[in-house]
């Protein structure tokens, strides 16, 4: 079991501990539960889906990286496939506050970058901030997304974001988590190709500036993140954050990164290079390359 889970695990009910123990035994537990695993946990504990998601939130929050606030938020995104994806907030010392990742963004990106097609619900241990409510409004599940909070009745996103402004107001038809492929040729080594593939999946209907980041760890594992724009612009999630979300949730740490590649267009209206390289250097990675999409 990864050490970060030990404290939260010890506080779970005995029957949930017993059912989870073989799942969490792997140090690199992927911070997700398949539909089959969810069903097994429900049977072992007698909990329904909502109660089980609430019970698992401490494990999701244990994935938080909060050296600035020490305020850990956990989220679980429930995919229409039946898979549940953990998420947690992340802060980066030495970077800017704008690079911060919120727990809801983490769980949603985890699902999206894992190939999930849409979300049915998201469970969070604290009320989503306005930033996250706007981020969620970019999803193809839209205002129908169900939000579950401890001690409250579940409500749709529309109840948390009345009179919402979103992609439909800008006549955007392709939404976040819809399948997208921008068709750039995969060239270069494996890490470069992973970055280009991530750029091909970008959701960037507002700037037309595709980008992707791939991080290579010392053991050869590669984590890729795609750019995810938002109709309100500021809640946009950069591609580096997508890759860092996966790296963190899969049990790796920043010192494990040995090389990074950013893929983007040289003449794009928005450029990720400066922010990406600055944040990576703050995390201790200095081997950073850029490949140009063509």
Curated annotation (Swiss-Prot):
Pfam families registered for this protein in UniProt: dCMP_cyt_deam_1, dCMP_cyt_deam_2
Cofactor detail note: Binds 1 zinc ion.
Signal peptide: none
GO-annotated cellular components: cytosol
PROSITE patterns, per database record: CYT_DCMP_DEAMINASES_1, CYT_DCMP_DEAMINASES_2
Residues noted as binding Zn(2+) in the record, renumbered to the chain: 102, 129, 132
Residue ranges constituting the CMP/dCMP-type deaminase domain according to the UniProt record: 48-168, 186-294
Keyword Hydrolase: yes
Quaternary structure, from the entry: Homodimer.
The protein's name in its UniProt record: Cytidine deaminase
Source lineage: Bacteria, Pseudomonadati, Pseudomonadota, Gammaproteobacteria, Enterobacterales
């Amino acid at each position: 079991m990864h050490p970060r889970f030990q404290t939260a695990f010890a506080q779970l009910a005995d029957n949930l501990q017993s059912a989870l123990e073989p799942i969490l035994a792997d140090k690199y537990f992927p911070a997700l539960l398949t539909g089959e695993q969810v069903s097994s946990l429900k049977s072992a504990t007698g909990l329904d889906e909502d109660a089980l998601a609430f019970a698992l939130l401490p494990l999701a929050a244990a994935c938080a990286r909060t050296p600035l606030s020490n305020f850990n938020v956990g989220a679980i995104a429930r995919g229409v496939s039946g898979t549940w994806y953990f998420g947690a907030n992340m802060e980066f010392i030495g970077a800017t506050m704008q690079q911060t990742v919120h727990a809801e963004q983490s769980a949603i990106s985890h699902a999206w970058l894992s190939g999930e097609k849409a979300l049915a619900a998201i469970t969070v241990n604290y009320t989503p901030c306005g930033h996250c409510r706007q981020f969620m409004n970019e999803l193809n599940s839209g205002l129908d997304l169900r939000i579950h909070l401890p001690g409250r009745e579940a409500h749709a996103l529309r109840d948390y974001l009345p009179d919402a402004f979103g992609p439909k107001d800008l006549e955007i038809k392709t939404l976040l988590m819809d399948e997208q492929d921008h068709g750039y040729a995969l060239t270069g080594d494996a890490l470069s190709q992973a970055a280009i593939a991530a750029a091909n999946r970008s959701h960037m209907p507002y700037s037309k500036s595709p980008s992707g980041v791939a991080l290579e760890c010392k053991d050869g594992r590669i984590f890729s993140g795609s750019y995810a724009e938002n109709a309100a612009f500021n809640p946009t999630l950069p591609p580096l954050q997508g890759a860092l979300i996966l790296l963190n949730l899969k049990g790796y740490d920043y010192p494990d990164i040995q090389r990074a590649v950013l893929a983007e267009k040289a003449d794009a209206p928005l450029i990720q290079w400066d922010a990406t390289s600055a944040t990576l250097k703050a995390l201790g990675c200095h081997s950073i390359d850029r490949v140009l999409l063509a």
